[in-house]
Amino acid sequence: MHFSIPETESRSGDSGGSAYVAYNIHVNGVLHCRVRYSQLLGLHEQLRKEYGANVLPAFPPKKLFSLTPAEVEQRREQLEKYMQAVRQDPLLGSSETFNSFLRRAQQETQQVPTEEVSLEVLLSNGQKVLVNVLTSDQTEDVLEAVAAKLDLPDDLIGYFSLFLVREKEDGAFSFVRKLQEFELPYVSVTSLRSQEYKIVLRKSYWDSAYDDDVMENRVGLNLLYAQTVADIERGWILVTKEQHRQLKSLQEKVSKKEFLRLAQTLRHYGYLRFDACVADFPEKDCPVVVSAGNSELSLQLRLPGQQLREGSFRVTRMRCWRVTSSVPLPSGGTSSPGRGRGEVRLELAFEYLMSKDRLQWVTITSPQAIMMSICLQSMVDELMVKKSGGSIRKMLRRRVGGTLRRSDSQQAVKSPPLLESPDASRESMVKLSSKLSAVSLRGIGTPGTDASASDVHGNFAFEGIGDEDL
């Protein structure tokens, strides 16, 4: 998550009280809450009481007199660095003190009273699930409510997450972010004041080996099946004509497990796909489509001649990555305290091991750069958990009474319709041996071509380089 305080506001106190400066905290470039310095000071003091002063980053000191505009701007910058440092700290950023502060501030900023409401959550295939929640319910509360409505067992809830998406005109989803523990889903989606924004339930892991755990349960199997069919229909999962024929045959037989077993062998199974954006690889200002999954970032690009190519960047070859944001100055070239900034430009840059002794920075410019970064981090976290022999089954925080609320009226996951005929522009993949800048770019076929699964090859540009070389 990218925390920033890009602007301040001068506001009047309640009931005609004295004016004060409000600091607008943004998450991923969107306003999350509006707080006073005194509120952040109270948070700091509470964290210091719980964790000790040595753990906390520096907090801007109190001032005896009113601040000048320059001092307000200086404090804004200091508070922004403080919030970023706290969020990035594994102990402080995951603490209930920090997260509950942000939830309360979000609810107060949007002036949403605590009451019971119906919240619509979509499955990957577009099926609607209506759950009764409180406006003050946090993300885990809502996730549990959806699981209860679908009759998904408690021990499988941790395999799924809620995502905030924007629904496009063609019905496809553009992923905004994974909903976090510091926000209230009802407030997050309604505060955007647009019917385009939805909440979607989707599996939250990358390694398809974990599918086995989920497929043991009927509801889990249906959720994976519905998501996979939807991803194939959207073109997120790449299939040949023959593979498509086999999948449709398994659909007709209602062989869901066999369908998923075959789908697991397909390119981009379980990937998240992002909107078209721009990268500086293999050349500057190159239009690309980025997908994340299977411990890699995949970049698809169309070269002269309309041939579609794909380059893969493994997370185990990334030395580090960073997200940077830049904001154009208002007309006139100068910025002043309290003035709003322009649209934020986001970039994800990662340093990649191109050859045994050569690292190169690759930059992707996209409004979804932070979501890409979160995907990278979660892939690394999952690899570390697997390496240590751990499990992604997480212990759930229990509600009062120690049990999960189960809905009186449960809802089944609808079986999706049969697959439609594949789009000729993406019906196959073919092997290409050409390489650009030491990263192999695989061809993804042209209309009328076909290939078997054995013709699909991974990125072997780094053969002979071990992970220990990083």
Curated annotation (Swiss-Prot):
Transmembrane recorded as keyword: no
Modified residues (Phosphoserine): 336, 407, 409, 415, 421, 437, 440
Region (Disordered): 400-426
PROSITE patterns, per database record: PX (PS50195), RA (PS50200)
Subcellular location(s) per record: Cytoplasm; Early endosome; Cytoplasmic vesicle membrane
Region (PTB-like F3 module): 270-432
Source domain of life: Eukaryota
Single GO MF annotation: phosphatidylinositol binding
Bilayer topology term: Peripheral membrane protein
Cross-referenced InterPro entries: PH-like_dom_sf (IPR011993), PX_dom (IPR001683), PX_dom_sf (IPR036871), RA_dom (IPR000159), SNX17-31_FERM_F1 (IPR048763), SNX17-31_FERM_F2 (IPR048767), SNX17/31_FERM (IPR040842), SNX17_FERM-like_dom (IPR037836)
Residues in PX domain copies: 1-109
One Gene Ontology cellular component: cytosol
Binding site for a 1,2-diacyl-sn-glycero-3-phospho-(1D-myo-inositol-3-phosphate): 36, 38, 62, 75
Keyword line: Cytoplasm, Cytoplasmic vesicle, Endosome, Lipid-binding, Membrane, Phosphoprotein, Protein transport, Transport
Region FERM-like: start-end pairs: 115-432
Classification via Pfam families: PX, SNX17-27-31_F1_FERM, SNX17-31_F2_FERM, SNX17_FERM_C
Subunit structure: Monomer. Interacts with APP (via cytoplasmic YXNPXY motif). Interacts with KIF1B. Interacts with the C-termini of P-selectin, PTC, LDLR, VLDLR, LRP1 and LRP8. Interacts with KRIT1 (via N-terminus). Interacts with HRAS. Interacts with ITGB1 and ITGB5 (via NPxY motif). Interacts with CCDC22 and CCDC93; the interaction associates SNX17 with the CCC complex. Interacts (via C-terminus) with VPS26C and VPS35L; the interactions are direct and associate SNX17 with the retriever complex.
Protein's job: Critical regulator of endosomal recycling of numerous surface proteins, including integrins, signaling receptor and channels. Binds to NPxY sequences in the cytoplasmic tails of target cargos. Associates with retriever and CCC complexes to prevent lysosomal degradation and promote cell surface recycling of numerous cargos such as integrins ITGB1, ITGB5 and their associated alpha subunits. Also required for maintenance of normal cell surface levels of APP and LRP1. Interacts with membranes containing phosphatidylinositol 3-phosphate (PtdIns(3P)).
Domain observations: The PX domain mediates specific binding to phosphatidylinositol 3-phosphate (PtdIns(P3)). Required for association with endosomes. The PTB-like F3 module within the FERM-like domain mediates cargo recognition via their NPxY sequences, while the F1 module (Ras-associating) is responsible for interaction with membrane-bound HRAS.
Protein's name in the database: Sorting nexin-17
Organism expressing this protein natively: Bos taurus (Bovine)
